[in-house]
Structures are given as C-alpha cells and as structure tokens.
Amino acid sequence: MKNFQDKVKKLVAEMRRVNQIHFIGIGGAGMSGIAEVLLNEGYQISGSDIADGAVTQRLAKAGAKVFIGHQAENIEGASVVVASSAINESNPEVAAAKEARIPVIQRAQMLAEIMRFRHGIAIAGTHGKTTTTAMISMIYTEAGLDPTFVNGGLVKSAGKNAHLGASRYLIAEADESDASFLHLQPMVSVVTNIEPDHMDTYGGDFEKMKETYVRFLRNLPFYGLAVMCADDETVMEIAPKVGRQVISYGFSEKADYRIEDYQQTGFQGHYTVVCPTGERIEILLNVPGRHNALNATAALAVAKEEGIANEAILAALADFQGAGRRFDQLGSFIRPNGKVMLVDDYGHHPTEVDVTIKAARQGWENKRVVMVFQPHRYSRTRDLFDDFVQVLSQVDALIMLNVYAAGEAPIVGAESKDLCRSIRNLGKVDPILVSDTSQLGEVLDQIIQDGDLILAQGAGNVSKLSRDLAESWKA
C-alpha cells in the first residue's frame, strides 16, 4: 500500500506543474467523474457546460469553478483543457486554448494519467458497460478494497458516479464512441458486446471498429486479463486475436463462467453461475433482465479471477440498486384509467431497447408495455433505422417524441415521423407522434390502461420529461 501511495504522490507532484484543469462539458457523466476524482486529489478544477444541473451544482459545491455557457474567458488560469468528445474545434474555449498554446486533451487521456500507477480495470462494450462498472465497483468496495471508480452513470449504491479511493484499484468505464479507450493501459479489460454504433468514428466500417477493440485489448500487459462475453458473436470472433489470457462468461455452454436457470420475478433475478472450477454460485439480483445477469456475471468473473471472496461478491450483487437511468422505477401512479408504473431507461440503441422490453415482459407478464421513445441522434436513427422499426414494434402502445439531435443537423429520412410511418406500415402497433412535449401527459392519459408499465426510453431529455411527469402525477 505504501509503495502505491508513494507512486501516486510522485505522479501528483509531477502534475503539480498543472495548476488548474479545465473541463469543457464538465456536466457530462464521464467528464464529471474525472473532474471529481481530480478535485478530491487536490487539483484546482474549472469547467463549463451549456446547462446547469445537479452534477454541475454538486461539483461547484465541492470547490470547482463552474461556468454555464462556453466562452473563451472561461479557460483563464488553466494549464490544460480536457474536452469531451461532443466538443468540436469551433468551440470558443478550445480555440482560445489552442491560441494560448494550452494543451487540449481527450477525457480518456486524463483518465489514463489517473490510471497510470494504479491497477486499472476497464469496462468496454456497446451496451452494459455502465452497469458492469458499477457492479465491479460495489464488489470491490464490499470487499474492503476502497477502489477509485469513474463511471459513465450514477452508481446508486454510492450516490455518485466517481470516488477517489485509498487503494491501488481503479475501475473505469472505457469509451469506444470516439476510440479514445485506446489511451488506457489497464490490467484487466472487460468487453460486454460489440455492435455497430458511433460508426462515424470508424468511417462506417464495422471491421475497423472490431480491430480497434483488438487494439484496446492488446493494451493489456502480457500478464493481464481479458474478460469477454461468450454470448456475443463478434466478441468471440476477435477473442483469438487478443494474444492475452481470455476468460469468458455468459449463457453459452462454452462460457468459462456459465449462467444457468435464470428466472425473474418483478425486479428480482435468480440464477446460478457455474465457475471454471465446477463451483456453483447462487446469485440474487435486484435489477431485472437477462442482460443484467450478464453484467453481474462479468463482474463476478473479474472479482473471482482477482481473488475476491464469494461473500463480498454475493453481498454486493444482492444489494446492488442499479445504475442511474437503467430501468429506473419512478413510481406507481393512479391515473383516470387506472394504476400504472413509470420506468425511466437510458437505452437508445435497438439492442438496448430490445433487452429493456424483454425485461419488462419477463418480470411483468400480464402488463401492457407502453413506450415513450425519443430517438437519439439523426445519424444513429439513419444507421439503425430498420432495427429500430422492428424493436419498437414489439410494444403494446408507442408514443414517439422528436429526435434528440445532440448537436446534429436533421437527416432526410431519419426523423421521428419516418420511424412512425415505417412502424405503422409493419402493422403491429400504431405509433403516436408527440412533437409538443408539454402534451405528453395528456396523450398518455388517453391511451394508458389499468396495470400498464410505461417505459420512458432514450438518452436525450426524455428522462427529465418522465421525471417531471412523475412529479406532476404525485400532486
């Protein structure tokens, strides 16, 4: 422990040439986590975001200087600027930093510096990485290891998305969206799945994306460990190319850590994990869905391979409350047509939406599933249009909101009205397009029935809309 602390002190001393670290997009989940860890390490932190919120307010209260809006003068005093992947070269703070010859780096480059003298565990994949990161963090915490963790979403059990621990362990979500996870040099890497997403980063070439994952895994030292999902065809395709020890997990009979007998009752999942030694471990989860069983088994595999006792693993998983905006129950409400349950979920890729619907069907077999879906980005809607049409046709009733642009310009044929038309033509559900979100509650009241499960689905502001709706329904 002393040797590790001496190394960290050396790194901090070397970085003391950095007087102030400025984050552009400090309110983002990944950015705020790194800012919080560095703030707790004693650095001066400043940052800007386009909107105020709970995250920016928490950072300001902790001592960060937070600006709302992007302006050149915000970087005054900064020794380095960290920019999120959503920030482009035309941003006034980026331009001002470059003019002043202040280094501008990616989020993952700063995360790599934090990881440099630590035992890094990096979790990557198209889906499930936030929840898996949270689960591993809670297992290591339960084991008394006090890890540092940086997650892309709220770890509900901890009440935050980042923590500066006293031990050598650093558990971090790795971002493939801009390929910046290649900066990381972990000891253990997890890959949950690989599917086409953020394809602009990879020039629309899925083969290039797969090769980038191989490069990420080859960043492991020769004695490192790759924990990979046996159920994902693409993950297993690249596994032989990694050149490092690979441990697999999943429902597949070929998995090293194999899931058996999964059952779900409401929010609870029960199943057995058969370990490589033949040991059988009974798991209780308080988060629903087979996808969460996969996430938990990835976390279990990491912990078992690193020598953590079963007691800590089982206790952490049984107590796990979920990650923020992952099948997040907002409450049950009495409406004019009966009692309904409202759930908020971040899933915005067809596969994520699909597993959320399946979790709802499996846990609440006799309920209608009513979805309020907000597509996220025109480019994603265009690239995965047919998949969205098929997946969204599985619900009993569908309200479609306008595409949340996330800074993108509209793309012809990739708007919500286009999705609605194609879903309607499929003939399974008749979607309702709600362009004025102030009418959402009224429209819902017209279509919901007693016992309905309402899923507010998407990565944009649909979460705020659903939470505002929940507050109004409580009144």
From Swiss-Prot:
The keyword Transcription regulation does not apply. Cell wall formation. It is found in: Cytoplasm. This is UDP-N-acetylmuramate--L-alanine ligase. It comes from Glaesserella parasuis serovar 5 (strain SH0165). Belongs to the MurCDEF family. Its main location: cytoplasm. One of its GO terms (biological process) is cell wall organization. It comes from the Bacteria. One of its GO terms (molecular function) is UDP-N-acetylmuramate-L-alanine ligase activity. Pathway: Cell wall biogenesis; peptidoglycan biosynthesis. ATP binds at residues 125-131. Its EC number is 6.3.2.8.
